[in-house]
């Protein structure tokens, strides 16, 4: 039953030889075909490591991407990636290379999307283990263009009525869900930082000062995501990972889930939530009282630093969470990916696998 008792968010550290190849490609000294060969090799090696650590579902580590979200969103028809003066949110420390998105035409999913080929390659090499595909949530396109970028956003004529924008994003994602399913995908994940931002009181105050009603936007997002999920076949699992920022081991949002819990946990028809709970920035487990029959994957093990968590403490926190959600609905994972962007978090390849081994051991001791 997906998500699995011990699971992953999705991204893994890029090996140095892949980073070197990407730099050579950017300089024009390596062709696209040559880069793809290097990516294929890195993904094959990664999948073997994922299987060796005992994962029930593997990903391609997002090794072909620069960012966890922009690559996919910019591949949608009607969306363009543009350079920016600064990143749309401020991380506490390192800052990513600045880029943003612009909606220039009718939004649609490209049925020849390279992301479908990315999944097909993963499925081809994974053997008999399950394959999980991660893509940014439908909410992310609106968040980047219309919320973070609210002061400069100008709706094209087609989307003067914002309801039309929400609807056509949902339709594009319906097409994406069907297309991934047709390639054999039975485990899809929406990655979403909007909810992390909506939990942060400073950000709520800032957006309110711009005239944005985050509570209404949150309801609109749940409605849009649920519309996208109407395309989900019975035998497909779609989960959501909620993040507060994960670049070079830093973050950009802070605050417990209470401000969004009733709307999101009580209203979103997703199959499971991957929730960050690796620090006090994520608050307590009380908001989980709004969970219905969804699985909750507790991100109790940080992907931001190499220090291994204490098993007893993690087990105690699982017990705490079980006061609000049945133990049988709970699972365990890292708090986020290890490399949400190509730069990666500040830990080693060996460190990330020690974390995964710890997660597996704890899960087996708790759930058997």
Model-found features: residue ranges?
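Domain-level signal for soluble alpha/beta catalytic cores
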Residues: 1-368
């Amino acid at each position: 039953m997906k998500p699995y008792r011990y699971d992953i968010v999705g991204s893994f550290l890029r090996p140095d030889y892949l980073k070197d190849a990407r730099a050579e490609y950017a300089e024009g000294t390596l062709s696209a075909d040559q880069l793809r060969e290097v990516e294929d090799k890195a993904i094959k090696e990664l999948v073997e490591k994922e299987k060796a650590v005992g994962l029930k579902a593997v990903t391609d580590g997002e090794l072909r991407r620069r960012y966890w979200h922009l690559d996919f969103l910019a591949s949608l028809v009607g969306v363009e990636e543009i350079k920016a003066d600064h990143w749309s949110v401020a991380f506490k420390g390192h800052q990513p290379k600045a880029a943003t998105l612009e909606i220039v035409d009718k939004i649609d999913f490209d049925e020849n999307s390279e992301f479908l080929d990315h999944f097909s390659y993963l499925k081809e090499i994974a053997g008999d283990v399950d394959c999980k595909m991660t893509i940014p949530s439908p909410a992310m396109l609106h968040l980047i263009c219309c919320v973070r970028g609210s002061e400069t956003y100008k709706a094209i004529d087609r989307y003067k009525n914002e309801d039309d924008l929400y609807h056509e994003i949902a339709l594009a994602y319906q097409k994406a869900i069907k297309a991934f399913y047709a390639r054999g995908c039975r485990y899809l994940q929406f990655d979403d930082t909007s909810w992390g931002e909506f939990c942060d009181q400073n950000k709520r105050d800032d957006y309110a000062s711009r005239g944005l009603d985050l509570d209404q936007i949150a309801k609109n997002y749940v409605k849009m995501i649920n519309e996208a999920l109407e395309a989900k076949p019975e035998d497909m699992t779609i989960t959501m990972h909620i993040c507060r920022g994960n670049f070079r081991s830093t973050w950009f949002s802070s605050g417990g889930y209470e401000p969004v819990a009733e709307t999101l946990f009580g209203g979103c028809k997703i199959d499971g939530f991957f929730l960050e709970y690796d620090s006090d920035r994520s608050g307590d487990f009380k908001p989980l009282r709004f969970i219905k029959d969804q699985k909750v994957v507790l991100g109790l093990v940080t992907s931001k630093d190499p220090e291994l968590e204490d098993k007893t403490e993690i087990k105690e926190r699982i017990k705490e969470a079980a006061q609000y959600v049945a133990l049988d609905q709970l699972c365990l994972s890292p708090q986020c990916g290890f490399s949400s962007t190509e730069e990666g978090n500040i830990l080693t390849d060996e460190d990330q696998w020690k974390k995964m081994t710890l997660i597996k051991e704890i899960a087996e001791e708790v759930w058997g």
